[in-house]
Amino acid sequence: MSIGLFENVGNSLQFAFDNTAKKLLRWIGLSVVFYVPILQFLAIGIFMKVYRGEEPDFSNAGKSFIQGLLLFIAQLVYALIPCLIIILSALFSASESLGAITVVGLIVGIVLAVILGFIMIPMQVNFARKQSFGAAFDFNTIFGMIGKLGLAKFILAWLLYVLVIFAASIVIGLFSAIPVVGAVILMLYGSFCGLFAAKYFHNLFE
């Protein structure tokens, strides 16, 4: 990809701004569904449209809702294995004779959770672009995406993304103390971050 990491941040922030502050009604609508249980799947589906290079609007809302729901299910499947390992390890911790197994199990579970957390990013991009549930588990393509980008660049891009979100959260947190205004800003912040993240990783794996 020709675009650099820092340029990607600027490009993605501009994209999020253009599709929120410049399209206020869409921003409000997206923010509402983003925080409403069940309807949140629609917001996820709209973010997925960005992975495909589409406009993040409410057209084909039914399709976006289904795709958001399917992505949520895929994420649950990814999270299931490390969670089970950690839970079983915690249960075994009551037995002194299984102390070593418990420690190993916890370490394995945590490491696996971190690895799958990284994999989930290209998984979401692949799922959104192919619009197929099976694409979420097409590990040849998913690992190929990481390999094409380069593991080091992928990790750096992820760290930069986390840093940007962390910095933005601190700034937003300062405004959250303002009555009413703070609550509105917090509500709008989630959907803005969703659009930023979708565009950022769309560019990364373009």
Language-model region placement:
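Intrinsic N-terminal pre-sequences and regulatory tails
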Residues: M1-G4, F92
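Alpha-helix boundary/capping detector
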Residues: I38-L39, L91-S95, G150-K153, A168-I172
